[in-house]
Amino acid sequence: MCTNVVRVFVILYLLAECGCIKYDVDDNVHICTHTVMSHINYTSWYYNDKVIALATEDKTSGYISSFIKRVNISLTCLNISSLRYEDSGTYKGVSHLKDGVIVTTTMNISVKANIIDLTGRVRYLTRNYCEVKIRCEITSFALNGSTPPHMILGTVDKWKYLPFPTDDYRYVGELKRYISGNPYPTESLALEISSTFNRFTIVKNLNDDEFSCYLFSQNYSFHKTLNVRNICESEWEALNNNDNASSVPASHNNLTNDLSSMTSQLQNDDNDYSTPMNVDNLIMIVVITMLSIILVIIVVIAAIAIYKRSKYSRHTDN
């Protein structure tokens, strides 16, 4: 428990290092001084400590090319419309007052953009277990005078932290590892972590399934989240569908065989029975049978009578 608390504080501390105001792409921002305009002699405006314009009572000059169409600068304000990701950085206005006093206004701006690619790929899958490799990669990043980036990937209980000094690390895709000694192309930086899930484990804390990737520096802060268990659930469902699909033909054949067997049995049963007789034939048979029985009875009675008569005649003669 103590370890988890420490990790949370570390993450929050690192994320707090940005110290900037966050905007979305296409937002508008206004950076203004609270000094009365009539008291200002001129104002110099800076972006990451580079002069971008000089504003006087009569005119403003020295726009940098990328700001010409999107920036309105005066003695007291710098207004930027339709923010871009590359506009992130430190803005400063230095106003020189007519009485010789210098007033400085500073603002750190972070423009959120989709420069992080967070993906999960299944490496091993069974009906009960699923292993996923989670990868967080910087797809595009311009320092723009900021400090080198730092990256955190994982959950509260399982995470990796990696700083990227500009002269120490470079990720080489062909080698699938980081090498040192050369400046890195920031767009190739990545962190990877693996995690295993049990299909039948009861999820008590949904945060255990949520993997987050943080990228931050002095003027930048980016964050993406991925539910990795959902990836495994999709794969398990696909596996079940494949199993069901493969069992359908066998079941269909069995059903067909059963129906054929039943049909054949019925046909055989029909063959075992003779064709039904009509009523007239049946009556004729009954009459003949009865007459035959009567005839047999008459013959028997006659035979008995003849036998008795012949026996009586012999007795009389004697």
From Swiss-Prot:
Keywords: Glycoprotein, Host cell membrane, Host membrane, Membrane, Signal, Transmembrane, Transmembrane helix. Its main location: host cell. Pfam families: Pox_I6. Glycans are attached at residues 41, 72, 79, 108, 144, 219, 244, 254. GO terms for cellular component: host cell plasma membrane; membrane. It is a single-pass membrane protein. InterPro entries: Ig-like_dom_sf, Ig-like_fold, Poxvirus_F5/I6_dom. It is found in: Host cell membrane. It comes from the Viruses. Residues 1-20 form the signal peptide. Induction: Expressed in the early phase of the viral replicative cycle. GO terms for biological process: viral process. The chain crosses the membrane at residues 282-302. Plays a role in the spread of virus to neighboring cells ex vivo. Belongs to the orthopoxvirus OPG049 family. This is Protein OPG049. It comes from Monkeypox virus. The lineage of its organism: Viruses, Varidnaviria, Bamfordvirae, Nucleocytoviricota, Pokkesviricetes.
